[in-house]
A protein has these predicted regions:
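Conserved alpha-helical substructure of the radical SAM core
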Residues: 7-9, 15-22, 27-35, 43-155
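Radical SAM enzyme [4Fe-4S]-AdoMet core and its adjacent flexible, acidic
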Residues: 3, 170, 175, 180-290, ...
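Short loop/turn microsegments at loop-to-beta-strand junctions
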Residues: 69, 295-297
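Core AdoMet radical
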Residues: 68, 87-96, 109-123, 135-149, ...
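Short, charged low-complexity linear segments at domain edges
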Residues: 45-65, 274, 314-327, 332
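Flexible mid-to-C-terminal extensions adjoining Fe-S/redox cofactors in radical SAM and related proteins
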Residues: 312-395
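Local cysteine-cluster metal-coordination motifs and their immediate loop/turn environment
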Residues: 76-86, 294, 309-312, 339-350
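Acidic (Asp/Glu)-rich catalytic clusters
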Residues: 107, 135, 156-160, 199, ...
């Protein structure tokens, strides 16, 4: 933690907030990857300009703007995952210059962490140029199936500034993973991508895993972590199935609070070993920490330019080709207070009621949903930091 405490201006942060952050960060161990000191991949390296921006703009400056964003670089993907948040999205893809401008605009709004997603983002031929356009004061993380990766492309991404990659791998057995992905060869593509990035030696390598309730409520999740440790990766990035598409709009698919806490405990126990970092999204976004920041601190721009709260929430407030991105984000923030639990888990039944066959749901349906949506009170961090809005219905 000394590396974090040495960050310029960290002493200007309120003591109660610093204590909160130290307790949270104390659940992880810093890992040196290349020249980067990394706590986990949902935060920039603590010795980076991006982390300094987090301290200066978000902690000291208390910026009201977003801190994190994800951009879909393409909707194309050879795999066919049943609960993929992007699979049913339609629309003409934006061009490279529009993506680069969106990155520039997001940084102006306060974004210091940017995730590239898809579809399969590696299928965007300009991905290296797009990565380089973010500069050295914004942390870039890539989410990929591994399809389309070459050693040359991996090296190009590293030179352009990529600091972390999450390769999708959901099961230790090849046949099971391939079946879930609807793509023969998915497992081998993922394993090749993991090895390719590890061979570079300077990119933080994670595996992103979507856990089913069956895996959570058996020994499968813990057994899988043991398998991942054997791959030599730096981090296991865990999430659960989200009710983002009609196939998952049912109670049987949605995690319970008890199951979330079970995964939090699993993460904490593994992190005490100090080997591979386990980073469970529901821990970061739990009410005891930072809560759900969809539409508040998190922004999602899909491959066709639709701007929404997060990758898991199929709603749009407008298209950046039709309205300025900053204007769309400001409106979205007014309607999306930061709450203490996952918005889509709490409100997916409203999507069932208002869905008209289009994904993402259009602006009209989005506003109708928000008239009925439930938002919880601010999570622990925002109660201390003073930026959480009161739990309420959006108007």
């Amino acid at each position: 933690m000394l590396a974090i405490l040495k960050t310029p201006r960290i002493a200007l942060v309120r003591p109660s907030v610093n204590l909160f952050l130290m307790r949270y960060m104390g659940k992880f161990r810093l890992k040196r990857v290349g020249g980067n000191l990394i706590l986990h991949s949902h935060l920039p390296p603590v010795n980076s300009k991006a982390f300094a921006r987090f301290v200066n703009e978000q902690l000291v400056g208390r910026s009201a703007g977003p801190s994190h964003a994800q951009i879909g670089l393409t909707s194309a993907c050879p795999q066919h995952c049943g609960c993929c948040y992007s699979r049913r999205r339609a629309g003409q893809p934006v061009d490279t210059e529009t993506i680069i401008k969106a990155i520039r605009d997001l940084k102006r709004l306060g974004v210091f962490w940017l995730g590239f997603t898809g579809g399969e983002p590696l299928l965007n031929r300009d991905i290296v140029r797009i990565t380089g356009s973010a500069g050295d004061d914004c942390a870039i993380k890539l989410f990929t199936t591994g399809c389309g990766l070459t050693r040359e492309l991996a090296a190009g991404l590293q030179r352009a500034g990529l600091y972390s990659v999450s390769v999708s791998l959901d099961h230790p057995e090849e046949a099971v993973h391939d079946q879930g992905r609807g793509y023969p060869g998915a497992y081998r593509a993922a394993r090749r991508a993991i090895d390719t990035f590890l061979d570079l030696g300077t990119v933080h390598v994670a595996v992103s895993t979507v856990l089913t309730r069956e895996m959570i409520n058996s020994s499968q999740a813990e057994d899988f972590l043991g398998f991942l440790e054997g791959l030599g990766i730096h981090e296991a990035w865990l999430s659960e199935v989200k009710p983002s598409v009609p196939a998952c709009w049912n109670r049987e698919a949605v995690i319970t609070e008890a199951e979330r806490l079970k995964l939090v405990d699993l993460q904490d126990r593994h992190n005490q070993k100090g080997k591979m970092t386990v980073n469970y999204l529901g821990h970061f976004e739990g009410r005891e920490h930072f809560g759900c920041n969809a539409g508040s601190k998190m922004v999602y721009v899909d491959a066709s330019g639709e701007v929404g709260p997060c990758v898991f929430t199929p709603m749009t407030f407008g298209n950046l080709r039709e309205r300025p991105l900053a204007e769309i984000v400001r409106e979205m923030r007014k309607r999306f207070p930061s709450g203490d639990s996952c918005f889509i888990n709490d409100n997916y039944e409203l999507l069932k009621r208002h869905h008209r066959g289009r994904m993402p749901l259009g602006r009209e349906e989005t506003l109708a949903i928000l008239k009925e949506a439930r938002f919880g009170p601010p999570a622990g961090f925002f109660q201390l930091h003073g930026k959480g809005d009161r739990g309420r219905r959006a108007r």
